[in-house]
C-alpha cells in the first residue's frame, strides 16, 4: 500500500483512435490483446500485461495527439487533496465516471508542466 500523494503504478493508458471498431479488430484480432469491455460507440478496453489500454474517439475540445497516463490510487480523495496542496493543477476533482457490475470507476484529471493530461484513477469494489 502506498501513502496518499505517492504515485507508483500505471493503471491505464489512453490512445486516440478515429474508428473504435477498426481499432478493436486490430488490437484484438491482429495483435492478440485480450479484450476486456467496451462502452460503444466511443470506448474499448484491453488488458496489456496488467495495464489497461483504453481506445477512444476524442471528445470535441479534448482532442490531443498524446496519450493519457492513469495512475492507480487506493484513496482518490486523499491523493487528490495531497497533490493539490503541492500545487498540482487539477482539471477535475475526483468524480465517478462509471459503475460496473462489481466496482465504481473514479477519476481526477490534471496536467503536467508541459500540458500533458494525467489522471488519478480508483476502482473501489462495490459492497
Predicted stretch roles:
Residues 1-21, 67-69, 122-127:
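N-terminal beta-strand motif that seeds the catalytic metal site of vicinal oxygen chelate
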Residues 1-6, 86-127:
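Vicinal oxygen chelate
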Residues 77-82, 116:
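Short amphipathic alpha-helices within nucleic acid-binding modules
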Residues 34-67, 117-123:
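Conserved short beta-strand elements that form part of the metal-binding/catalytic scaffold
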Residues 52, 70, 107-109:
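Short hydrophobic/aromatic beta-strand element in the GNAT-like acyltransferase core
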Residues 7-8, 14-53:
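Core segments of cupin and vicinal oxygen chelate
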Residues 29-30, 81-87:
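Short amphipathic alpha-helices in soluble, non-transmembrane regions
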Amino acid at each position: 500500500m502506498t501513502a496518499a500523494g505517492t504515485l507508483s503504478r500505471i493503471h491505464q493508458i489512453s490512445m486516440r483512435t478515429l474508428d473504435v471498431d477498426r481499432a478493436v479488430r486490430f488490437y484484438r484480432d491482429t495483435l492478440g490483446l485480450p479484450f476486456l469491455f467496451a462502452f460503444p460507440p466511443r470506448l474499448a478496453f484491453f488488458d496489456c500485461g496488467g495495464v489497461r489500454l483504453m481506445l477512444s474517439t476524442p471528445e470535441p475540445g479534448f482532442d490531443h495527439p498524446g496519450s493519457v497516463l492513469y495512475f492507480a490510487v487506493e484513496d482518490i480523495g486523499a491523493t487528490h487533496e495531497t497533490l493539490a496542496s503541492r500545487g498540482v493543477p487539477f482539471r477535475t476533482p475526483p468524480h465517478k465516471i462509471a459503475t460496473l457490475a462489481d466496482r465504481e470507476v473514479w477519476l481526477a484529471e490534471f496536467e503536467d508542466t508541459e500540458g500533458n493530461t494525467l489522471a488519478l484513477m480508483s476502482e473501489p469494489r462495490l459492497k
